[in-house]
Amino acid sequence: ISGNMRMEAVIEPVKGLLISLNMIYEDNRRTELQYMVDGMPVIRGGSFAMSTVAISNYGTQAFNKFMQNREIIATRVHGQYRNLNLQDIFPEGNPVIKSNSADVLIPAFISAYTGRNPDKTGLTAFPDILTLLPNWNISYRINSLTLNHRYVSQYRVGSYSSFLSWKPVTDNKNSNLGYIRDPASGALIATTPFDIPAVSIIESFNPLIEAQSVLYNDVNMSVRLNKTRSLNLNIASNRVVETSDNDFI
């Protein structure tokens, strides 16, 4: 099942200046029936991508914000379970929400690197379509000179699948609150249904600035600066890896 949406708007506020705004939202889902396994369990999974904006959230400052946001998000996640009567599931009544769990790390990552308020960021790895932010392409032409600028940024969940042992804590079919059993210790771990190994934000200015000109002798001249950045949150290793690249052409 695919739920993909693309939107684009082009405006020309002044002659020669074209501004293109575009947004994408891709929610691809799959369902697998394991008919060769006892009980024929169903595995759900898929991939996800949406346009966003991550400008100004760079380096150490953004990472420190990510670390701080974990505590705020963990408190909010715990609050979702706190109002439920879970003594028959968890011996202590409420589960312990760890700051390095996927349910905490992913919203903290999104809020830190897209500049969102951690008190209002959705507690999900799949942000709502209403949180889409546009990317843009700007072109300005005057006489024989053309200036170009383009910004593309996407938040992505490359691939995920459901936990086979996941069980819900409520009868509400719209709720993702539940738990799995740790295969090593046997302890119950509060979690949403999906095992998400990694999420990322890919950002590029392609170009940051480009100047194209046709000289009087019909020779084309072009100067271009590209900037790209990749942010990857690996859940298993609890690492955020940031890489960047600058190209001058």
Model feature map: region roles:
Residues I1-I249:
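Exposed, low-structure sequence patches enriched in small/polar residues
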